[in-house]
Amino acid sequence: MIELQGLSQRFPGASGDVHALRDVSLSIAAGEVFGIIGRSGAGKSTLVRAINLLNRPSSGRVIVAGQELTALDTGALRLARREIGMIFQHFNLLSSRTVYENVALPLELAGKPKAEIAATVLPLLDLVGLSALKGRYPAQISGGQKQRVGIARALASKPKVLLSDEATSALDPETTRSILELLKQINRDLGLTIVMITHQMEVIKQVCDRVAVLEAGRVVETGRVIDVFLRPQHDVTRAMIGDVISQELPASVLKRVESRLGNGRDHVYRLAFTGEGVDQPVLAQAIRRYGLDFNILHGHIDEIQGQAFGSLAIMATGELADVKAAMEYLQAQGVVVEEFEHVV
């Protein structure tokens, strides 16, 4: 559905060009929810605005639904953009227009007749749960409701792609969850391809199928969300996952175990489980098989896209050869094993 090939973006700066994007290539499949995450200044918003050419890249190709947008003239690009909806952190509603009229605006600008506008807008208001508020003005509704208006407006032209640029970052956690559930429903019901730009790994965890991690204008990691959580490859990814699932031992636990390390018999590991592995007694089996003692130091169980995900920090006590054999056994059972390097 979306192909980004070698995108680079340079902006003039006081001391030379600023490189906002550096040779970014991504492939996003039709019907998936794809997340792009990074810290502030990583280039996320520049990248999402390159998809609909609100920012034209300095070099590279943008292909959406088989059409190369970077090769289109102004008129053809205007038509192509109708198939790409967009929602923003700030809702950009017109204060003088009602909820209904805000959603109808792009159809009015396209010259659609009133009957066709009504046939499109009313079902959209029902979809986003705002039918009862269609006559209200933006000042009379909440932030979450304003974002629902923005979503309905973005869907009015029946796009194939929806771009979401930090659409939940100004909302409280409960409202964020409701908006993410709405986007998941839209993805399921309409088969819409959604690209989520965010700095919040919690958003990625809740709604995305795959994710790309952006740092200093480059894609440093990409993959299925569950795989990225299980096996983060880049320091930036590990840090951002740590925002929602702690990857480090708490200081109180670290202090307690430090005195036992270095004796050759005690080793600290992080174990990550997913899917059916969360429910299997693999630790008990490893203890019996290799005659070890396992002390659980820290643990966390969560859910990613409906799939159970567990993380444990353990101290394994026994002969080094037996400990290593036990870790290899756990890996063979699908457990991700990582030794805490800063502890041992």
Swiss-Prot record:
From the Swiss-Prot or TrEMBL record, give the protein name: Methionine import ATP-binding protein MetN
Q: Which InterPro entries match?
A: AAA+_ATPase (IPR003593), ABC_transporter-like_ATP-bd (IPR003439), ABC_transporter-like_CS (IPR017871), ACT-like_dom_sf (IPR045865), MetN_ABC (IPR041701), MetN_ABC_transporter-like (IPR050086), NIL_domain (IPR018449), P-loop_NTPase (IPR027417)
Q: Which residues form a coiled coil?
A: none
Q: Does the keyword Membrane apply?
A: yes
Q: Where in the cell is it found?
A: Cell inner membrane
Under Gene Ontology molecular function, one entry of this record is: ABC-type D-methionine transporter activity
Q: Which reaction does it catalyse?
A: L-methionine(out) + ATP + H2O = L-methionine(in) + ADP + phosphate + H(+); D-methionine(out) + ATP + H2O = D-methionine(in) + ADP + phosphate + H(+)
Gene name linked to the record: metN
Under which EC number(s) is this enzyme classified? 7.4.2.11
Q: How does it assemble?
A: The complex is composed of two ATP-binding proteins (MetN), two transmembrane proteins (MetI) and a solute-binding protein (MetQ).
Gene Ontology CC annotations of this record: plasma membrane
Function recorded in the entry = Part of the ABC transporter complex MetNIQ involved in methionine import. Responsible for energy coupling to the transport system.
Q: Which PROSITE patterns match?
A: ABC_TRANSPORTER_1, ABC_TRANSPORTER_2, METN
Source species, domain of life: Bacteria
Which residues participate in ATP binding?
A: G38, R39, S40, G41, A42, G43, K44, S45
Domain ABC transporter per the UniProt entry, residue ranges: 2-241
Regarding the membrane, this protein is recorded as: Peripheral membrane protein
| Organism expressing this protein natively | Cupriavidus necator (strain ATCC 17699 / DSM 428 / KCTC 22496 / NCIMB 10442 / H16 / Stanier 337) (Ralstonia eutropha)
The UniProt keyword set, sorted, is:
Amino-acid transport, ATP-binding, Cell inner membrane, Cell membrane, Membrane, Nucleotide-binding, Translocase, Transport
